[in-house]
Amino acid sequence: MSNKYISQLFVKSLQTQKLENSIAKNEKNTLVKGLIGSSLSFVISSIFSKNQKSILLILENKETAAYHFNDLEKLNNDNVLFYPESYKNPYATSNTDNSNILLRADVLNKINTNPNRYLVVTYYKALFEKVITKTSLGFCLFFFNIN
């Protein structure tokens, strides 16, 4: 079976249509339960392809988020972003992962500068880290002219 065929089955399902309606009505919080394996990825992918809004998908842990990110990237090709946490260990702030810091900055930059819609996949630990606001960053920047 191809991905398109499976996606069409999920698009036609009553549960997916109800979820699409709740998103169309601008309901702020939506909880999806009972989906196992890649079925969540197919449902989110079908909603993302029909919807003109960005989606923030918050999952339980890093492994689950990476699993669904991989699925969604294969199903949607573009505009799927992964937002990781920057620390390797929760309480060792000096032990940061530079590649994750770069990924986080790239995701935030794309969201702030591009008008495109995005499907951002993350997990709760990544959302708890503070991020500097654009206004605060503006106060900390210095510009030099070199002649």
Task: For each feature predicted by the language model, list its residue ranges.
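ASCE RecA-like P-loop NTPase motor cores
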Residues: 1-147
